[in-house]
Every structure is written in C-alpha cells, then in structure tokens.
C-alpha cells in the first residue's frame, strides 16, 4: 500500500466495520507464510492469516471460492499447483481454502488447537526447506500435517490435488519446475 492509502485503511473503525482489514492482513500474511509459500500459491497461502483476522474481528470467515469449485477441479483431475489449467495463473480464491479448511477443522472445531503452531514450527525447523524442490515441499507439507494431526490426511490432500502427479513449469514470480511423481505420492 502507498503511504496515501494508510488514511483509508488504518483508522480502527474502518478496519473493523468496513472489512478493510483484508488487504493489510494479506500483506502481513506474506511475512508469515514462508513455510507454505511454494510456487502456485504465493498470493493465496498468506490468506490463511487474512481469513484468521476476519474471524477474530467477527466478520465473514472466508473470501475463498465455494467448495463446488474444488469438486470441479477434482473431477477434472487438476493438480493443486495448476487448478486453472494455466501455469501463469494462480487460483487464489480456491487455493486459500485448503489452509482455512485445516484451520476450521483443527482449531475452530477444537480437534487439535495447536495444529498450525506445531506445523509451522516443524516446517521452520527443517533448515533445508527452501532448497527442496517445490513438489517435494508439497509432499512434505502433507507428511508433516499428518504427523502433527496424528491422522492420515492423504484423502484430504488428494481432494485438493496434492496427490495428482504433475511435471510442468509454473510461471509465478519466476519460472519453477513443479514435479510430483507417483513414487513421491506413494512415499507420503
């Protein structure tokens, strides 16, 4: 945001009553998303934090697309990194939902209220994380999330296209090869 935008967004009454907190929360989310910021979701994984801010101030709880969009992507066997079928476009409105669905289940429903703090800690403690190819990071996320949850979350992540083999170049903030193989899926 430019300095002139601060007057529009920063007065507390406007942030809360007019739902203007999404933009600042989205930008601050970029500071916290490191462990879940992989190619194809740079502009959506940070919205876990935006959705949380909306929840905390009592506003609507998600800006994400309806889950019927997810069902369509699954029906068409699209991998998570390329739900739109265009390697230059991120499906931000549905991508943000995966992180929020996990929060709703584990935190809001009280299943495991330390799920995200523990998951982020485990991801942060992997000092090699940023050097791991993006497809491997995706599968590591599945493994770590399942470990922290003490549940096999493979079916959940399969619905979200994590368990769909893919080998393509994604053009988002640079060019990155995104590879998830059947062998990687089987290992997870």
Model-derived features: positions:
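Residue-level detector of solvent-exposed, low-hydrophobicity positions
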Residues: 8, 107, 123, 167-169, ...
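Beta/coil-rich, acidic/histidine-enriched accessory regions frequently appended to metallopeptidases
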Residues: 133-188
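Catalytic cores of extracellular degradative/oxidative enzymes
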Residues: 1-108, 113-119
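Generic structural signal of hydrophobic/aromatic residues within well-ordered alpha-helices
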Residues: 71, 76, 80, 119, ...
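Gly/Ser/Thr/Ala-enriched C-terminal appendages of enzymes
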Residues: 91, 95, 99-142, 146, ...
């Amino acid at each position: 945001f430019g300095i002139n935008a601060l007057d529009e967004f920063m007065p507390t009454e406007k942030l809360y009553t007019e739902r203007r907190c999404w933009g600042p929360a989205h930008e601050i989310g970029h500071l916290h998303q490191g462990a879940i910021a992989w190619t194809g979701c740079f502009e959506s994984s940070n919205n876990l934090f935006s959705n949380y801010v909306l929840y905390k101030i009592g506003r609507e709880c998600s800006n994400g697309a309806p889950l019927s969009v997810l069902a369509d992507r699954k029906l068409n066997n699209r991998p998570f990194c390329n739900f739109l079928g265009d390697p230059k476009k991120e499906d931000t409105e549905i991508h943000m939902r995966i992180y929020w669905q996990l929060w709703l289940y584990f935190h809001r429903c009280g299943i495991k209220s330390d799920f995200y703090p523990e998951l982020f800690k485990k991801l942060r403690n992997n000092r090699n994380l940023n050097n791991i190819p993006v497809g491997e990071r995706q599968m590591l996320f599945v493994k770590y999330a399942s470990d922290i949850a003490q549940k096999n979350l493979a079916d959940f992540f399969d619905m979200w296209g994590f368990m769909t083999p893919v080998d393509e170049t994604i053009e988002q903030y640079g060019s990155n090869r995104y590879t998830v193989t059947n062998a990687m899926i089987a290992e997870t």
